[in-house]
Amino acid sequence: MFEDFINALQNFKQNKTRTFLSLLGVIIGVASVILITTLGQSATENVKKSFGSSGLDIIKISSGFMNRRSASRIQFNESFRTELWENIENIKKIHLINNLSATLVYGDLSVNGSGVAIEHDYLQMYNFELEYGNFFSVTDNISGSQKIILGSEVAQALFPEGNALGKKIILISSNIRFGFEVVGVLKEQSGGMENPSTSVYIPRGFYSKKIQPNPIASSIVCQVTDQKLSTKVAENIK
């Protein structure tokens, strides 16, 4: 063994350049692996940050989401929701939503916004937070309450001095006027799959009773049990 050690030292002396280059190659290789791993982790965190607090566990289903053959025969209604519950695993929540163009009016001020008719706890599913006020209750949706939650930019446009809570505003859609009470204002969101800043939200129960009876949903939003399963669940739905 001692002779082997002596031979190794002699080889090192005779091949210093080769040994140095070999060590340099190993060092560069290890450093590259560390750098790539670090960049990969950083990219993953950046993606998560860009989606905001809403996470990556949300699947939004619209006609364009479905394959062409399925889309021609599917209606986004209660029957389709039941079909999803019964046939697709790893779904935690299913929400039917309807979109509407809306003009909001308070006194002499008005602003255009994206109206969304939602079901109970839809906003909580996205982890949206309130600047003040309350979210819709189950009763609000069932009874079709004339309540409205404003995105931060809409609230600022209509109530530049703040204090929108409890105020009565007018929502105009398809040239029809509806009165709503402001029950909440959302905090400004830094990012995410859905940015509510320029949106307003009303109970879908009101939409289905007063605006469009027995409506087919504009889209369906599903929350999966684990964000790692999102791709698999989406493929199963298609």
Identify what each model region corresponds to.
Residues 99-104, 135-138, 169-171:
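Short, solvent-exposed loop/turn elements at beta->coil junctions and helix N-caps
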Residues 121-135, 146-238:
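Mid-to-C-terminal secondary-structure elements
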Residues 8-11, 26, 46, 50, ...:
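Amphipathic alpha-helical segments that mediate coupling or scaffolding at interfaces
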Residues 1-30:
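N-terminal Sec/SRP start-transfer signal
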Residues 40-114, 121-124, 156-157, 208-209, ...:
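Hydrophobic, regular-secondary-structure patches
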Residues 19-23, 35, 166:
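Signature of the 12-TM Major Facilitator Superfamily
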